[in-house]
């Protein structure tokens, strides 16, 4: 029997993060990050961007994909924090 991996899309992640920002579940790391503000989120983005670069230079594709996923997460947290929507970004692509 084939097993299927559940895949979270960029849009689904954004919806999940937006929901957490709205409902503020106790113990949520996303809520804690939002409460840390733009400065704290920005520091995480810089950290993750560096880790993406290092993974691209020195690690395999699996590690690189994981680091990119973390950078995308933090970028979306910043978007939610600033009130940007996916459409705001899509218009710039």
Swiss-Prot record:
Keywords, alphabetical: Amino-acid biosynthesis, ATP-binding, Cytoplasm, Histidine biosynthesis, Hydrolase, Nucleotide-binding
Coiled-coil ranges (or none): none
Single biological process term from Gene Ontology: L-histidine biosynthetic process
Catalytic reaction list: 1-(5-phospho-beta-D-ribosyl)-ATP + H2O = 1-(5-phospho-beta-D-ribosyl)-5'-AMP + diphosphate + H(+)
UniProt superkingdom: Bacteria
CC per GO annotation: cytoplasm
Pathway: Amino-acid biosynthesis; L-histidine biosynthesis; L-histidine from 5-phospho-alpha-D-ribose 1-diphosphate: step 2/9
SUPFAM superfamilies documented for this protein: all-alpha NTP pyrophosphatases
Assigned EC number: 3.6.1.31
InterPro entries found in the cross-reference section: HisE, PRib-ATP_PPHydrolase-like
UniProt subcellular location: Cytoplasm
Predominant subcellular localization, coarse grouping: cytoplasm
Keyword presence, Nucleotide-binding: yes
GO MF term set: ATP binding; phosphoribosyl-ATP diphosphatase activity
Family under the similarity heading: Belongs to the PRA-PH family.
NCBIfam families (UniProt xref): histidine_hisI, PRK00400.1-1
Protein name: Phosphoribosyl-ATP pyrophosphatase
UniProt source species: Mycolicibacterium smegmatis (strain ATCC 700084 / mc(2)155) (Mycobacterium smegmatis)
């Amino acid at each position: 029997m084939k097993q299927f991996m559940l895949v979270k899309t960029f849009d689904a992640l954004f919806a999940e993060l937006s929901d957490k920002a709205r409902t503020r579940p106790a113990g949520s790391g996303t809520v804690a990050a939002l409460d840390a503000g733009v400065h704290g989120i920005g520091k995480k983005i810089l950290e993750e961007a560096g880790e993406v670069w290092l993974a691209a230079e020195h690690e395999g594709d699996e590690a690189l994909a994981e680091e990119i996923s973390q950078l995308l997460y933090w970028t979306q947290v910043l978007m939610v924090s600033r009130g940007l929507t996916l459409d705001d970004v899509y218009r710039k692509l």
